[in-house]
Amino acid sequence: VGTRISYNLYKKFGNNKLRENTFAINFKGSAGQSFGAFGVKGLKLILKGDANDYVAKGLSGASIVIKLRDESNLISNENTIIGNTVLYGATSGYLFAAGQAGERFAVRNSGATAVIEGCDSNGCEYMTGGSIVILGEVGDNFGAGMTGGMAFIYDPKSQFAKKANPETIVWQTPETEYWNCLLYTSPSPRDCLLSR
């Protein structure tokens, strides 16, 4: 779901004429593979349920929200809500998932922004751009081949160093003035640089 709609939106409006979230579509249930694949700017998909592999594959500006059904008894941060290889090749757009992702989350992401509650092995593999926030544990080999972008990992148990791939990424706790400004005060990196 999303590919055909995105094709028609792009054909009619191009890639930059629509404002974000111009067309919002709500879904309920279990989505199959490639939910929201190639979604373009102007499209917002909201799913109450769960989704299989390749969610947001090739994401190109759309916003995707996936959360548990209202009647669910599950605790979001303890359960997988999206499958493997999510955000594969995404160039822009947003993904917000109230739950964990499977393996290879954000592989080859080059510009999308996402927030999830944990992922399995090989997260952010070959990532070249974009921003990822993971509010939970990550699996082994995190950041293998990652050459760009930023990943922010909530790590209250200090386990991230054991999971990260030390050959390709550098990590640190955000204790500098710049990061405190960016994360807690201003959404603009420029403002944080000027305030120094």
What positions do the PLM features span?
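Terminal or standalone catalytic/regulatory effector modules within metabolic enzymes
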Residues: V1-N52, G61-V65
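Short, T/G/N/S-enriched strand-turn elements that build extracellular solenoid repeat scaffolds
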Residues: I5, F13-N15, Q33-G39, A51-L59, ...
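Detector for repetitive beta-architecture
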Residues: T22-A24, G42-K44, G61-S63, S92-Y94, ...
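Feature marks extracellular polysaccharide-active and adherence modules
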Residues: K28, F38, I46-D50, K57-G58, ...
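Glycine-rich anion/phosphate-binding loop at the beta-strand->alpha-helix junction
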Residues: Y54-V55, I64-K67, S72-S76, F96-Q100, ...
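Acidic/polar low-complexity surface segments
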Residues: A62-V86, P166, V170
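Terminal amphipathic helices with adjacent charged low-complexity linkers/tails
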Residues: D155-Y178
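Single conserved hydrophobic/aromatic residue that forms the stacking wall/gate
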Residues: Y184-S195
